[in-house]
UniProtKB/Swiss-Prot annotation:
Source species of the chain: Arabidopsis thaliana
Composition skew (Low complexity), residue ranges: 394-414
Listed Basic and acidic residues bias regions: 309-319
Residue numbers spanned by region Disordered: 309-343, 381-419
Domain C2 NT-type positions: 81-229
Biological role stated in the UniProt entry: Seems not necessary for chloroplast and nuclear photorelocation movements.
Entry protein name: Protein PLASTID MOVEMENT IMPAIRED 1-RELATED 2
InterPro entries membership: NT-C2 (IPR019448), PMI1-like (IPR039614), PMI1_PMIR1-2_C (IPR048972)
């Protein structure tokens, strides 16, 4: 018979030809030697003359080794054959990564990589270091895959299967930080006709660029895309004769199917279409049962899918993102002279279904969707009834739900058997679904979920007719059930004795939902217990609300009674944190059996930082702060923080570093645990404890250092605005230093969004004079002893009025602070900083203006020295901003990198905008110096003046102000 005659043949003739193909399949199956496997039901592909359209195939797996019937995922074979009728090309996509330009200067020295991702495969370039805002790559990445195309585009143009690729940039030190990602379909660069793809040289280059985001928002990634067709062989399933050859080179017949109506192949075929199986399924089972009944329990089927060693890709319609599926290929040429150019397409079903045991959750979704969609029509039409001779068959249904070794006769099945099989499928699905329910669900959630499943699965149709005759969906029925339970809880409000009868409510529920007798028998006791538990919990909630309302009424309170409660604010990053007046915020302990603070060997202290400062951090990394011994600066250094820094800058970088490390040193604890620091620190057991005694470890303060670490943390987190003794000033100001230190870290790492107003020169003085003034600084204990001696020599009347201490009424305390990460063996995070605290002596009576927290924390007898009170006027933080990427006397290169890494990893690289400095210092601007990168002294001051009444408006105030940068004298001299 010629090709034209076959195309004009009727549907009956087509069915006969299809049966002959199936006979060849069955013969090949019987002659295959190998271990027995579960029976696989396969519907052979029905090919169409259309290039891009095929019909659906269904597969069912019945496995005796499985503990429960798990429905088979029908999407996988559909995705595997979705390319039938299309042309396949082996394409090699090339990605040329040129460079990244326009990177911010703060990323200089950072190593970046460009990653090219296709599903589970990720290709990465070699790391490239950023130099002056540019990262050079000049590297090519290659990805080879199969591309299927058809002539279904406009004007018979080529239409390719989508190939989505993800391109993104990330730092090597922080691979989780993405600096911009872009999705792109590389089939857009393929030609518009399939003939060009088959040409001798099929290639095209596309140059483009992508904008980055995040920290590299202003940067541009320059790329080039290219492709090349690896081979010229094209697999066109519609242009070649298709044959099925059995193993052993037994001659077979070559047939061509007549044209059928085109059906669009999508990733997710509707359940109703998937049930319309091919007629060959029933015939294949019948032949298997007649010719080889002893092997009906399992027959090995070795089939494969024609393709090469590459992956066949398909779109995931659920998320719009493609999923990855590897397919094995097998292509055999026929030895029959009558089939010269014929090819065989083999489907390896075991390879496709090798992960069936791992995809239980995906499979159950199919049966759920299938059942609901089929219920909308007629229950009797759920199972396929195809026949070659006009007789209805349901062998497919029996294979799904039965694990017996017998092959039932299709003619013996009637509608009642189909209905029983359908109910058995749903019952098996329910058992599998309930067995997969997480045991971690609480009773309420489990009760609601079980009631919902029972409703959906025990009804025989998706519509329930109410007494009004109108159909309602299961969702509406579930809503009505919840309304009834809420109404039952409402009746409880009227009957406080709890004697309401809820069993009748369950009976009414069953009547309203028109449940059958079998529905009420399955799980009725369980539903009653869960519903009763749910109602009991609601009763307890209602009782609690009633008791609360009664107490409020007895105390003459209403809902607005607590709106104006007094509170104290302590800022985090951006928004205030309100704390009760009578209770401060407890700091986290530094370790097991250790309080929030410990002394170090050199007399300093390690303190736990307020964890609320890191509540906006992505990784919630908790830092600790190492604080040095405070010193009192001489008044000749200046009365303003900016003036003091100008004299510091006049001493030079090396002189300043050496003097600061000598006066207020910080012990190197890197690589040591907190317990090791505590063990090494051996102080005399006198004075006040630094750690909380209730924690079990007692570390005494060193002699000569007064209350740097407050034992009860009464000042650190409460921010008491009143007057305190001088030795408690550091504890009072520590929270402000916490906030300023985070901003200071950003300034050091060039990640602050605020630039300094300008740069000024240091004080015009000799370097030796500046160093001598710094050396005159006294420790806090020494200054207190000196001040007490001055008081003893003065008249008591003058002392009480404060007139005898004109030169000593204003002081500036300086201490060195350093952030450390306890999770990295106390590694320094950034460079150390100088905290400057300016205080003023209070002229009021000590007993009247003593801070309430100080009175509660210690007895006044323990103050000593007749307890002079002080109040904080200004808190500032200063540091050195040096050339990045180089070791420096102030900090090392690793400290700079660790600070940048921590800011990037925790997402704290953005800050609150600062207001301009209001300092009256004369600005001497040097344009040439400010244009170049110079070593400068930066500083910020807190806008909280710690005076009574200031905290009322603290929420609206800016937390800090950026001062002018002070440029070191030698740097300016060399560049002027």
């Amino acid at each position: 018979m010629s090709v034209n005659d076959r195309e004009d043949s009727s549907a009956d003739l087509y069915n006969g030809q299809l049966l002959r193909d199936i006979k060849e399949v069955s013969k090949a199956l019987y002659l295959t030697n190998g271990p027995q496997r579960p029976v696989l039901s396969l519907s052979p592909p029905v090919r169409s003359q259309s290039v891009s359209r095929t019909t659906e195939i269904g597969l069912v797996l019945s496995n005796k080794k499985k503990k429960s019937l798990v429905p088979w995922n029908w999407k996988k074979p559909l995705n595997a054959i979705a390319h039938f009728g299309q042309r396949r090309f082996d394409v090699c996509f090339l990605l040329h990564v040129h460079s990244i330009e326009g990177l911010p200067l703060n990323l200089d020295g950072t190593k970046l990589v460009v990653q090219w991702k296709r599903k589970d495969e990720v290709m990465t370039t070699q790391p490239s270091k950023v130099l002056q805002g540019t990262a050079e790559f000049e590297e090519t990445l290659t990805h080879r895959c199969s591309v299927y195309g058809s002539k279904h585009g406009p004007h018979r143009s080529a239409k390719y299967q989508v190939k989505l690729f993800l391109i993104y940039v990330s730092p090597v030190d922080a691979p989780w930080l993405v600096l911009g990602k872009h999705w792109i379909d590389l089939t857009r660069i393929l030609p518009l006709s399939l003939e060009e793809m088959e040409g001798t040289r099929s290639t095209r280059k596309w140059n483009t660029s992508f904008k980055l985001s995040g920290l590299a928002e202003s940067a541009v990634l320059n790329l080039s895309f290219d492709y090349s067709v690896v081979t010229s062989s094209v697999c066109d399933s519609t242009s070649k004769n298709v044959m099925l050859r059995r193993v052993g080179s037994v001659p077979s017949m070559d047939h061509r199917s007549p044209p059928l109506d085109d059906g669009k192949v999508v990733n997710e075929v509707s359940p109703s279409l998937s049930l319309n199986l091919s007629q060959s399924i029933d015939f294949l089972y019948e032949k298997l049962g007649e010719q080889n009944p002893q092997r009906s329990t399992g027959t090995e089927v070795e089939l494969g899918l024609e393709t090469d060693k590459q992956a066949a890709d398909s779109d995931d319609s659920g998320k719009g993102v493609e999923t990855f599926q590897q397919e094995r290929s097998g292509l055999e040429e026929s030895n029959d002279p009558n089939t010269e150019s014929s090819r065989i397409e083999i489907i390896d079903v075991h390879e496709i279904l090798k992960d069936e045991d791992e995809s239980v959750f995906e499979e159950t979704y199919f049966i759920d969707q299938l059942s609901v969609a089929a219920l909308k029509s007629e229950p009797s039409n759920l199972l396929p009834k195809h026949s070659v001779d006009g007789t209805p068959k349901s062998t497919f249904s029996s294979q799904v739900i039965s694990e017996s070794s017998e092959s039932k006769s299709p003619s013996a099945m009637d509608d009642s058997t189909e209905k029983e099989n359908f109910l058995e499928v749903k019952s098996s699905y329910k058992a599998a679904k309930i067995s997969m329910t997480s045991l971690s669900l609480d009773d309420i959630t489990e009760s609601v979920a079980n009631d919902f499943l029972n409703m959906l699965e025990l009804e025989e149709c998706s519509y329930v007719y109410t007494s009004d005759g109108e159909p309602t969906s299961p969702r509406e029925s579930l809503l009505r059930e919840f309304e009834k339970e809420a109404f039952a809880s409402g009746n409880f409000l009227l009957d406080l004795n709890g004697e309401a009868e809820y069993v009748s409510d369950i009976d009414e529920k069953s009547n309203d939902f028109s449940f059958s007798a079998s529905s009420l028998d399955v799980g009725e006791n369980k539903r009653e217990g869960k519903s009763q538990l749910l109602i009991d919990r609601r009763k307890a909630k209602v009782l609690e609300d009633l008791e609360t309302e009664t107490l409020l009424r007895e105390c003459d309170f209403d809902d607005n009674s607590f709106d104006n409660s007094l509170c104290v604010c302590s800022d985090g990053f951006g928004s205030p944190i309100e704390l009760p007046v009578d209770k401060g915020l407890d700091l986290l302990p530094l370790g097991d059996n250790i309080g929030p603070s410990v002394w170090t060997k050199g007399g300093g202290c390690i303190r736990s930082m307020n964890h609320l400062l890191f509540r906006e951090s992505k990784e919630a990394s908790q830092l600790i702060m190492q604080v040095s011994v405070p010193v009192v600066l001489v008044s000749e250094l200046g009365s303003d923080i900016l003036e003091i820094l100008q004299i510091f800058a006049a001493s030079g970088i090396e002189g300043l570093c050496s003097e600061v490390n000598a006066l207020i040193p910080l012990e190197d604890i890197m690589g040591k645990t907190i317990h090791e620091v505590v063990d090494v620190t051996k102080f005399k057991r006198t004075g006040q404890d630094c750690s909380d005694k209730s924690k079990g470890v007692v570390v005494q303060k060193p002699p000569g250092q007064l209350h740097l670490c407050s034992s009860n943390e009464e000042f650190g987190s409460s921010m008491c605005p009143s007057n305190v003794p001088l030795e408690d000033v550091t504890s009072l100001a520590i929270d402000e230093i916490y906030i300023l230190s985070i901003e200071g870290l950003k300034i050091q790492c060039s990640m602050s969004d605020q630039d300094p107003p300008s740069g000024i020169a240091p004080k015009p003085m000799d370097q030796s004079d500046a160093l001598e003034l710094i050396r005159f600084s006294l420790t806090l204990d020494e200054w207190l002893r000196l001040d007490q001696g001055m008081l003893e020599n003065k008249d008591q009347d003058l002392a009480s009025n404060g007139k005898g201490h004109t030169l000593r009424n204003k002081l500036t305390l300086a201490l060195q602070v350093l952030l450390r990460d306890p999770s990295l063996n106390n590694e320094p995070i950034g460079a150390s900083m100088l905290a400057l605290i300016q205080v003023e002596r209070s002229l009021d009576s000590p007993n009247s203006s003593l801070c309430s927290l100080a009175q509660e924390g210690r007895n006044k007898e323990s103050f000593g020295y007749d307890t002079q009170l002080w109040r904080i006027t200004e808190i500032g933080l200063a540091g050195l901003k040096i050339e990045p990427g180089a070791d420096h006397p102030w900090c090392t290169k690793s400290q700079q990198q660790s600070g940048s890494r921590w800011l990037l990893a925790n997402g704290t690289d953005k800050t609150i905008k600062c207001q301009a400095s209001e300092s009256k210092v004369i600005i001497v601007s040097n344009v040439q110096a400010t244009r170049k990168r110079l070593d400068t002294l930066w500083s910020i001051i807190s806008d909280r003046h710690h005076q009574e009444g200031d905290l009322s408006n603290s929420a609206a105030s800016v937390p800090f102000t950026r001062n002018l940068d002070v440029i070191f004298s030698n740097e300016v001299t060399e560049r002027s």
